[in-house]
Amino acid sequence: MIKVTLVYPFFKPFYDNSLFRFPPLGLGYIAASLKRRGVQVELVDCTFLSREQAVSRVRQSKPNIIGFYSMFSMKKTTMELAALLRNDCELLVVGGPLPTLDPAGYLDIFDVVVLGEGEAAMTEIAECHEKGVGFSDLDGVAFKDNGLVTQTSPRKQVEDLDSLPFPSREFFDNEAYKQHYLKRFGYSISPLITSRGCPFSCDFCSRPVFGQSFRSRSAGNVVDEVEEIAGLGYDRIWFADDCFTLNPKRLLGVCDELVKRRLNMSWECLSRVDTMDHEVAVKMRRAGCLRVFFGIESGTDKVLDLMRKQITVEQARKAVYNSKAAGLQVGAFFILGYPGENDETVLDTVRFASGLPLDYLSFTLPYPIPGTSLFERTKCNDCFVVDDWEEPKNMALIRHKLLYSSGFSEAKLKFAIGKAHIQFYGKRFLGKRGYSFVGSPFERATDAVFKLMR
């Protein structure tokens, strides 16, 4: 019987200081799909391993096929590990966001690239290899034919997500993941994906694998997996969808099912501000939601339009206040210095963000991800450094590194981020009265300094 070993090359040495570590659900889905078709499978999650340990585990599994997951921050480690294991298998396969966008960039080492969703493709690749036939009749793959890169027709996306088996979580080091979070936050959290695809077209967002077609699992199917995760000893769920609240009817169905089953599992999620009204927020809280995160990104409608966010500042304000009124903790993400911004729009965002009743906020500089409209507009600028995406140790810094020519200097934007954090935490700890005495002069002075900076 043919054997497949799947590898997630997210190495421990690069991420010892990382607060957030999640198991590779995508490979978990592929492993479960292979098992369902009778294929022998192993999964080596390198998150808590050294490179030497990872190589040893893969070799011990004695696979016919090795399949890698790769993304923007993993290309270098993926290629290095694949080169080490080239002679330990008959076939090397890779998939994920970056291979889907740039299959040719992987085919000097890999034999086959999976384009898009991988469950059916990887199963069919294994079956073809076992039969000794080629891959030209498969949809959604790329390979070299006489030295030339060949891409087959796109594969149809999985429409019925309930038809997929749950990820094979037995391959993950669940105890290590639980202890990682218990030591840092006092609770253990595990991700769960309830939908695929996003119908929006934000300027900075890349969707190479799941695309724009939104597909979702049924409420009962979702909560069945919540029960499975609870049985593994986790006490919190991270709904890892791009926007968990996109379909209000389904969302409320999930909430009702969670309440009905009395699982005592808390959870958190990402949301869009235009989907969060008071009724939704209240039902989410009653169903165990503790925290919701919004990608607000800017405090001006002009910049939101540049980003193609299809939201307004007023919608963002209402969503935050609706969530807080329901008893939810609220986090928000903002970008400073977006192409087309000026000093006033940056300061407007700083004022808006620091004035919201948030529990958590994050500011980043614009970082152009391959496959996005933002990337296409900025990649020709002289100071754009694509290689930074391929160096894992740089990823902790990438959100605060200016990767392209801009009307703002990196130092000026970092000053704005520091100013925003001081204003935000100053208002939280000093209160309105205390901050009005100390904070107003600070804001005026730092506004002036910011405008003078280049």
Residue ranges and their predicted role:
Residues 13-14, 102, 146, 248-249, ...:
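Flexible glycine/acidic-rich beta-alpha junction loops that bind and position SAM and/or redox cofactors
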Residues 10-12, 138, 144-194:
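N-terminal [4Fe-4S]-dependent radical SAM core
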Residues 2, 20, 26, 30-160, ...:
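Glycine-rich beta-alpha loop elements in corrinoid/cobalamin-binding modules
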Residues 22, 167-333, 351:
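Radical SAM [4Fe-4S] cluster-binding motif and immediate context
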